[in-house]
A protein has these predicted regions:
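Short N-terminal secondary-structure initiator segments
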Residues: 1-15, 149-157, 164
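Short, surface-exposed, charge-dense and proline/glycine-enriched linear segments
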Residues: 59-67, 84-88, 271-277
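N-terminal active-site beta-alpha-beta segment that forms phosphate/nucleotide-binding
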Residues: 2-82
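Structural signal for hydrophobic packing residues in well-ordered secondary-structure cores
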Residues: 24, 28, 44, 48, ...
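Polar low-complexity intrinsically disordered regions
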Residues: 1-5, 126-131, 276-277
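Alpha-helix capping and helix-coil boundary motifs
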Residues: 11-12, 86, 223, 228, ...
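Conserved phosphate- and dinucleotide-binding cores of soluble alpha/beta proteins
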Residues: 68-255
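Acidic/aromatic/glycine-rich contiguous surface patches that form carbohydrate-binding/processing clefts
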Residues: 245-277
Length: 277
């Protein structure tokens, strides 16, 4: 979807990335996931949060890549980092030691209590239903797995999530909890030795959701320009609730769009050159 905001044209994907970038503030330490989180975190670094410290799972600290990495092992991350440490040090000292302000994650599937699934799709959720022909042992789709996301969700002081909005991704109950949000009933973190408070915001291409302070169920707090309540309801696999005071997300600025598009153009050019080399 493309939106026209006076003279600015932008896509729903650009809206999502820029909104996610705005959630990051200056002088915070962010443990970044690959994909959409990395895109948003680097846009933040290149715009309003130049002093944000980006950390990747491979052990790169305060990295400032000129192009987006394809994986946590991308050489661009090491070349532009202040320093690198071992993976055990990254997890045991930095993450488990409570030094990470924000964990920035993506996912294949998310439920109403912000639990994430990147392990298996064991049912067909496209129409909001379940297909019993599939299971964990015989999944419809087997996904890459959790990587460092379970540890990030447990130990980062708070977690940001960014994911495209559809009934396939936003399901009432995830097929498998790879990364805990608030558990199956919203109380799953209460008896766990968590350092962090869990997910604080979910940014999609349609809206912003935040956990209810009491129930921990995700609630829509802001609609992106051009998005209606009906759009969100139609794309969500449960009876989603809306905040009494519903905001409209500010549209991307010309500067934000320029930075994002230049970053993606540099990335495409660099990776294309690698493929032909």
């Amino acid at each position: 979807m493309t939106t026209n905001n006076n003279t600015l044209h932008y896509t729903s994907a650009e809206m999502m990335t820029i909104t996610a970038a705005r959630a990051l503030t200056n002088n915070t330490t962010c443990f970044v996931g690959i994909g959409l989180p990395s895109e948003a975190a680097n846009v933040a670094r290149l715009t309003h949060a130049p002093e944000v410290t980006l950390i990747y799972e491979s052990g790169t600290l305060q990295t400032k890549p000129d192009v987006l990495p394809l994986s946590i092992g991308d050489g661009e991350l090491c070349e532009s980092a202040l320093t690198t440490v071992s993976v055990p040090e990254m997890f045991r000292y930095w993450l488990q030691g409570g030094h990470i302000d924000v964990g920035f994650l993506g996912t294949a599937q998310i439920d109403r209590f912000a639990n994430l699934n990147t392990t298996v799709i064991a049912a067909d959720h496209s129409e909001g239903g379940k297909n019993g022909a599939h299971s964990y042992a015989n999944p419809k789709v087997r996904l890459p797995g959790g990587g460092g996301a379970p540890e990030i969700s447990t130990n980062a002081k708070e977690v940001f999530i960014t994911v495209k909005h559809s009934k396939r991704t936003f399901v009432k109950d995830v097929d498998f909890i790879t990364t805990i949000g608030f558990g199956r009933d919203g109380k799953g973190r209460e008896n766990l030795p968590n350092i962090g408070r869990g997910p604080s915001i979910v940014i999609t291409d349609l809206c912003i959701l935040k956990p209810d302070p009491i129930t921990k169920e995700l609630m829509v707090t802001s609609l992106h320009p051009g998005t209606t309540k009906e759009d969100v309801i139609e794309a969500t696999g449960w009876e989603v609730k809306f905040a009494d005071s519903l905001d409209t997300t500010p549209a991307p600025s010309e500067k934000e769009l320029h930075v994002l598009r230049e970053l993606k153009a540099r990335t495409e050019k660099a990776h294309s050159a690698q493929e032909t080399a």
